Amino acid sequence: MIQTQTMLDVADNSGARRVQCIKVLGGSHRRYARVGDVIKVTVKEAIPRGKVKKGQVLKAVVVRTKSGVRRTDGSLIRFDGNAAVLLHNANEQPIGTRIFGPVTRELRNEKFMKIISLAPEVL
């Protein structure tokens, strides 16, 4: 579960390394974001000559969480860390052209099919 002030790793090649959640989108007093939810983030750590710079405010979709995701068959998929993929603020398409690490099947809707197709592994 991701909330305000949570630090996340970035799972794409946009140039950011670490981001911090500053708002969970989708409701006036929404507290937690799970896998597949869109959040507002600020870049805390970035590599030189990347597509994004430190201090930029962007949207991101959560792709991995330590708390995991519960499936309807009762199974629970957990990850070692929290990770997100950065999105353009206007059209919510990914900034990076590559995705690192596995992503879950919960992202499989019309909005995030691009992330599913770029990911090396879908759990």
From Swiss-Prot:
GO terms for molecular function: large ribosomal subunit rRNA binding; structural constituent of ribosome. The keyword Nucleotide-binding does not apply. Binds to 23S rRNA. Forms part of two intersubunit bridges in the 70S ribosome. The gene is rplN. This is Large ribosomal subunit protein uL14. Belongs to the universal ribosomal protein uL14 family. Coiled coil: none annotated. GO terms for biological process: translation. One of its GO terms (cellular component) is cytosolic large ribosomal subunit. Keywords: Ribonucleoprotein, Ribosomal protein, RNA-binding, rRNA-binding. Pfam families: Ribosomal_L14. It comes from Chromohalobacter salexigens (strain ATCC BAA-138 / DSM 3043 / CIP 106854 / NCIMB 13768 / 1H11). InterPro entries: Ribosomal_uL14 (IPR000218), Ribosomal_uL14_bac-type (IPR005745), Ribosomal_uL14_CS (IPR019972), Ribosomal_uL14_sf (IPR036853). The keyword Glycoprotein does not apply. It comes from the Bacteria. Part of the 50S ribosomal subunit. Forms a cluster with proteins L3 and L19. In the 70S ribosome, L14 and L19 interact and together make contacts with the 16S rRNA in bridges B5 and B8.
